[in-house]
């Protein structure tokens, strides 16, 4: 029946399943018999198929900083495109950065942060993503800008759709917060997208009789589910609890800090105290949904397939002018419909477009909220020393790739597609760089490039987008709803192409296409680079406890820890070689006996007397040297 409220059930589709489809097959991909699991090394190969240098960008401003990275708004010097550069600042987070790059390169959804490319500098990978002009959801909620209930419901629906897509791929976020939900400001309203997939993990499958090992305790404590904080078994329902905390932030416009959002001693939501923060203008189903998602029992939390349907139903039930219409009409009988006030009628009540929480200033540390009782509450996160009051971020050391994210290649296993450098990264008509010294990032040899007609980059059509096939899932059809959905972004405005020549054609009509990182990545540079006595410089991404190459090398007697490896049919990335993805019969490069001074040089080192003029950025990024 039209308008009937969809039920909220606890158990939903199994991990990796899509509604209406069965579980993944024995092969793990769910694409039918005979289709094997795609090799994970090709996922990384495609993710870094286009490399940019730090010097290719002009740093506009620093827009944020997290626990492990700094975020900059940058502009590409040649194309003028504005992007976001997420620079990793801790060596211990290198694995998570690589895991995030691999995953984001294969996610295609309007409510998932779009991956633009990779910037490499001094052996570290930094992700390039689209720029969101609205900032984070946390910043929007703490601002004095009014947000009506339809706007808040649309923001919640966008986040739920992004997570529904992510879960349909067999992956869950594990670090969903209002800081990691970004907002795009448009003429028609706001659009929310989900970002920061550094802690994403495959959805575990706990079988009866099998040994069950819990995943690591990771995430931001204020949004972490109780079962995660207790070190118990957890799955994708932990994302549902985090989504419930985000809904509480949306409804009451308060931070997730327990000093403002009341919590219980078992890390649950203090429902009676939270109700005192919510005005009577809040749609009751919206409030009940937030309480339902924060249930302490994971099995009772609804999956995102049902949460999105429920949010769409709530939007359909809202009155046309605003959810405060019934209350506002008792005070102002002259209010008119959305078409605008008439010259002969009184001005409509301003609360028609604003919720009750908009009528008050955002909370401040000096004025804690009044929860309507005199009970003394204790911050449960301050009772555990390892959580440090909840103002930290728990990180895990990645071990394996999150997903085999690359579809099967149409080429034979002995024939790998070439890696091409986009023409926009190289000035048209200029010869290949003679200077290969650090700290400039490696540039693929010119012989690997594809000749592009014309002076500028060609337009990349929808056929260049790759379809993602992994873990028993197919492209998920988006049900029609009142929330505005952006069409899937194609790479026409991207200066960096994130697809290889083995990509499969994709049509927007077919619907949205659909970290446990290796501990070490060794990237060998092309021949001719300076930096070592035998003209073979190398970038090294060692384990978390390893130091930079600029540090003094260990004594020769120290044992060298071998790199983990997975078999692959050949060398990866052409001139680049990733140790954890390839087990080629090559000797391990010896440790440099002398300190590498290339990273400290003030000018570039050139060969054969040729000196290239370094770029002169007006505002240098951290670590960028010319």
From Swiss-Prot:
Annotated GO MF terms: ATP binding; metal ion binding; protein kinase activity; protein kinase binding; protein serine kinase activity; protein serine/threonine kinase activity; protein serine/threonine kinase inhibitor activity; protein serine/threonine/tyrosine kinase activity
Keyword Metal-binding attached: yes
SUPFAM superfamilies the record matches: Protein kinase-like (PK-like)
Modified residues (Omega-N-methylarginine): 338
Processing and modification events after translation: Autophosphorylated on serine and tyrosine residues.
Means of activity regulation: Activated by autophosphorylation on Ser-220. Kinase activity is inhibited by SPRED1.
Impact upon substituting residue 539 to Y: In breast cancer samples; infiltrating ductal carcinoma; somatic mutation
Disordered: annotated span: 1-41, 331-373, 423-488, 529-564
Biological process according to GO: actin cytoskeleton organization; establishment of vesicle localization; negative regulation of cilium assembly; nuclear-transcribed mRNA catabolic process, no-go decay; podocyte cell migration; positive regulation of protein localization to nucleus; positive regulation of stress fiber assembly; positive regulation of substrate adhesion-dependent cell spreading
Subunit structure: Interacts (via both C- and N-termini) with SPRY4 (via C-terminus); the interaction inhibits TESK1 kinase activity. Interacts with TAOK1; the interaction inhibits TAOK1 kinase activity. Interacts (via C-terminus) with SPRED1 (via C-terminus); the interaction inhibits TESK1 kinase activity. Interacts (via C-terminus) with PARVA/PARVIN (via C-terminus); the interaction inhibits TESK1 kinase activity. Interacts with YWHAB/14-3-3 beta; the interaction is dependent on the phosphorylation of TESK1 Ser-437 and inhibits TESK1 kinase activity. Interacts with SPRY1, SPRY3 and SPRED2.
Primary role: Dual specificity protein kinase activity catalyzing autophosphorylation and phosphorylation of exogenous substrates on both serine/threonine and tyrosine residues. Regulates the cellular cytoskeleton by enhancing actin stress fiber formation via phosphorylation of cofilin and by preventing microtubule breakdown via inhibition of TAOK1/MARKK kinase activity. Inhibits podocyte motility via regulation of actin cytoskeletal dynamics and phosphorylation of CFL1. Positively regulates integrin-mediated cell spreading, via phosphorylation of cofilin.
Name of this chain's protein: Dual specificity testis-specific protein kinase 1
Taxon lineage: Eukaryota, Metazoa, Chordata, Craniata, Vertebrata
The gene coding this protein: TESK1
């Amino acid at each position: 029946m039209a308008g009937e409220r969809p039920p909220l059930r606890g158990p939903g589709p199994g991990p990796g399943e899509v509604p209406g489809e069965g579980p993944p097959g024995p092969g793990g991909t769910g694409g039918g018999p005979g289709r094997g699991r795609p090799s994970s090394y090709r996922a990384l190969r495609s993710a870094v198929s286009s490399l940019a240098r730090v010097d290719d960008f002009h740093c506009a401003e620093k827009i944020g900083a997290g626990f492990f990275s700094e975020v900059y708004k940058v502009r590409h010097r040649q194309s003028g495109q504005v992007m976001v550069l997420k620079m990793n600042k801790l060596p211990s987070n290198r694995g998570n950065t690589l895991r995030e790059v691999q995953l984001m390169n294969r996610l295609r959804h309007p409510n998932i942060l779009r991956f633009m490319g990779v910037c490499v500098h001094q052996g570290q990978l930094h992700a390039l993503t689209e720029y969101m002009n609205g900032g984070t959801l946390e910043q929007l909620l703490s601002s004095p800008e009014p947000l009506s209930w339809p706007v808040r419901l649309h923001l919640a629906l966008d986040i739920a759709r992004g997570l529904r897509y992510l879960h349909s791929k067999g992956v869950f976020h594990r670090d969903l917060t209002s800081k990691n939900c970004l907002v795009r400001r448009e003429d028609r309203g706001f659009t929310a997208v989900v970002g920061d997939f550094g802690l994403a993990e495959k959805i575990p499958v706990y079988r009866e009789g099998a040994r069950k090992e819990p995943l690591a305790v990771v995430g931001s404590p204020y949004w972490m589910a109780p079962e995660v904080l207790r070190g118990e078994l957890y799955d994708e329902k932990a994302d549902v609890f985090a989504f419930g905390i985000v809904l509480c932030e949306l409804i009451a416009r308060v931070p997730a800090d327990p000093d403002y959002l009341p919590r219980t001693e078992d890390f649950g939501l203090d429902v009676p105290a939270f109700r005192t923060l919510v005005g009577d203008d809040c749609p009751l189903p919206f409030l009940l949904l937030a309480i339902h998602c924060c249930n302490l029992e994971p099995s009772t939390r609804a999956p995102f397939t049902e949460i999105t349907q429920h949010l769409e139903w709530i939007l359909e039930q809202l009155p046309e002018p605003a959810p405060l219409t019934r209350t506002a009409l008792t005070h102002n009988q002259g209010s008119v419909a959305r078409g605008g006030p008439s010259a002969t009628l009184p001005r409509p009540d301003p609360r028609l477009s604003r919720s009750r929480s908009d009528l008050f200033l955002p909370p401040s540390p000096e004025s804690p909220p009044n929860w309507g009782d005199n009970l003394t509450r204790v911050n449960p996160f301050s009772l555990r020393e390892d959580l440090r009051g909840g103002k930290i971020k728990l990180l895990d050391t990645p071990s394996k790739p999150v997903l085999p994210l690359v579809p099967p290649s149409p080429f034979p296993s002995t024939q790998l597609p070439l890696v091409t450098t986009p023409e926009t990264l190289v000035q048209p008509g200029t010869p290949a760089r003679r200077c290969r010294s650090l700290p400039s990032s490696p540039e693929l040899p010119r012989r690997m490039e594809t000749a592009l007609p014309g002076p500028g980059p060609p337009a990349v059509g929808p056929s260049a987008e790759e379809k993602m096939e992994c873990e028993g899932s197919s492209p998920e059809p988006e049900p029609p709803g009142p929330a505005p959905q952006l069409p899937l972004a194609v790479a026409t405005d991207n200066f960096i192409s994130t697809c290889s020549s083995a990509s499969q054609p994709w049509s927007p009509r077919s619907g949205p296409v659909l970290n446990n990182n290796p501990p070490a990545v060794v990237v060998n540079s092309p021949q001719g680079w300076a930096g070592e006595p035998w003209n073979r410089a190398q970038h090294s991404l060692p384990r978390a406890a390893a130091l930079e190459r600029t540090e003094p090398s260990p004594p020769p007697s120290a044992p060298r820890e071998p790199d983990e490896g997975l078999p692959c049919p050949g060398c990866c990335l052409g001139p680049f070689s990733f140790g954890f993805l390839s087990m080629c019969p090559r000797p391990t490069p010896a440790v440099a006996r002398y300190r590498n001074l290339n990273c400290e040089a003030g000018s570039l080192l050139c060969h054969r007397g040729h000196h290239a003029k370094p770029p002169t950025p007006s505002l240098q990024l951290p670590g960028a040297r010319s």
